[in-house]
């Protein structure tokens, strides 16, 4: 089988992290976001992954080349010269996706984190005999999204309602699809929306089905959702592979610590924390609801919550970082500095406190 991942462009919503790496290569739970997807695809027999991309394809391919060998999977790029929406990239990559076997192929949005129940999706798609199957997820506030209205008994999609004023359902598109090659005949090589143009036409022919996604789901394309997504991911990991989570008197709740990280004495870590490779957490540090990326040093008695600490940054002694502070790569926060939210661009030094959320350039 084959898969296409819609990588897209500049990842502006996740800056300053995407100033250093393309968004799919930003670490999530101690590995690049896109690697979570590629590993799950490999498990169900996908042998080739096509990345639909219009920004820095050489960075993506160079980084993923090691994983090609480790996973035994082929990774290629289909590069757009102009933005083609969410359907145009499928037409552009047609020759890479169609091999004459007639097998369906996966399409994924690169921002989506879930348990990736691809085996169940394959079974559902074959059993229902549709041309396309989309995964949907239930949300508490459907008025913020485009709602998928479907027959509960059959899974057949009836219509799509964009940001409904009245309640029509609570299921939204989860950004995970399984499509027959014939879907490509419906798509022209031009900027096109698969959600607003292609799927409604398939639905009108009674050939579009929806499978309700089991487990958690989150689009982690912006910082607040990234933090929420980490909590949901760690909750899921507790149920599936609890042995991968850290344990000890200094651990509270779900915490993921890379084996090469070093944790000092008297720390309190958790809940909902990921500490990446090569990190050094000195004595007396308090961490909660945060991600600490590769190569970070957190000095004695610092406190970090609801924040993301970018690669190779340093947080000084007794510093306090909270309220959705996002440090880019190689940021150095001084001793006793307080940051109350904000975005700090890469390679900056913060010597004085930030009392209101701001962008530090």
Curated annotation (Swiss-Prot):
Residues involved in diphosphate binding: 9, 11-13, 23
Presence of keyword Nucleotide-binding: yes
Binding site for GDP-alpha-D-mannose: 6-7, 85, 109, 111, 146, 173
Gene Ontology process terms (BP): GDP-mannose biosynthetic process; protein glycosylation
Pathway(s) of this molecule: Nucleotide-sugar biosynthesis; GDP-alpha-D-mannose biosynthesis; GDP-alpha-D-mannose from alpha-D-mannose 1-phosphate (GTP route): step 1/1
Pfam families, per the entry: GMPPB_C (PF25087), NTP_transferase (PF00483)
Gene Ontology MF term list: GTP binding; mannose-1-phosphate guanylyltransferase (GTP) activity
Keywords: GTP-binding, Nucleotide-binding, Nucleotidyltransferase, Transferase
Top-level division of the source organism's lineage: Eukaryota
UniProt xrefs under InterPro entries: GMPPB_C, GMPPB_N, Hexapep_transf_CS, Mannose-1P_guanyltransferase, NTP_transferase_dom, Nucleotide-diphossugar_trans
Top-tier EC class: transferase
Known EC number: 2.7.7.13
PROSITE patterns membership: HEXAPEP_TRANSFERASES (PS00101)
Any one GO CC term of the record: cytoplasm
Substrates-to-products reaction catalysed: alpha-D-mannose 1-phosphate + GTP + H(+) = GDP-alpha-D-mannose + diphosphate
Its job: Catalyzes a reaction of the Smirnoff-Wheeler pathway, the major route to ascorbate biosynthesis in plants.
Entry similarity comment: Belongs to the transferase hexapeptide repeat family.
Protein name (record): Probable mannose-1-phosphate guanylyltransferase 3
